[in-house]
Curated annotation (Swiss-Prot):
This is Ribosome-recycling factor. Belongs to the RRF family. It comes from Acetivibrio thermocellus (strain ATCC 27405 / DSM 1237 / JCM 9322 / NBRC 103400 / NCIMB 10682 / NRRL B-4536 / VPI 7372). Keywords: Cytoplasm, Protein biosynthesis. Gene3D superfamilies: 3.30.1360.40, Ribosome-recycling factor (1.10.132.20). The gene is frr. It holds the Pfam family RRF. GO terms for cellular component: cytoplasm. GO terms for biological process: translational termination. PANTHER family: MITOCHONDRIAL RIBOSOME RECYCLING FACTOR PSEUDO 1 (PTHR20982:SF3), RIBOSOME RECYCLING FACTOR (PTHR20982). It is found in: Cytoplasm.
Amino acid sequence: MDEYKNIEEKMKKTVSVLKDELNTVRAGRANAAILDRITVDYYGVPTPINQLGTISVPEPRVIVIQPWDAQILKEIEKEIQKSDIGINPNNDGKVIRLVFPPLTEERRKELTKLAKKYGEDAKVAIRSIRRDGIEKKKAMKKNGEITEDDLKSAEKDIQNLTDKYIAEIDKLIEIKEKEILEV
């Protein structure tokens, strides 16, 4: 039974990673999570932007980054420009403003494709976890540790777990698509 918990834990982790990835996909509204992957070289240490200052969303399409150390403003601005978020930062010497323009139809479709790709990657990971779990059970059967019936039962249980998490992934992707396509 311990293997099931292990398999389920891995599947939960995969879904959790997918949620984090989907948070970084911009969907018309400003979301501070899109900055999570951007790091700034702060005294020789790559540091996430959210650890360098206050990030706020004062308006639906604006993110304001107010660093605690004003000297790092230029570095933050440079890293945001180098990133793939597609927003040009406005630096006024005290804060950096990221103004999100309304998404074009073309950009919405690109973001939808990206969300679907993340979903497919997660499904592949789930299926890989399923395959590994079933292979372990088959090896146990081969070694005489479990019976044929136990193997069939285990395969069914693992498949049910897989179906559950694949459905959860589909639901997450569907929600994200609606969010992206919402005008």
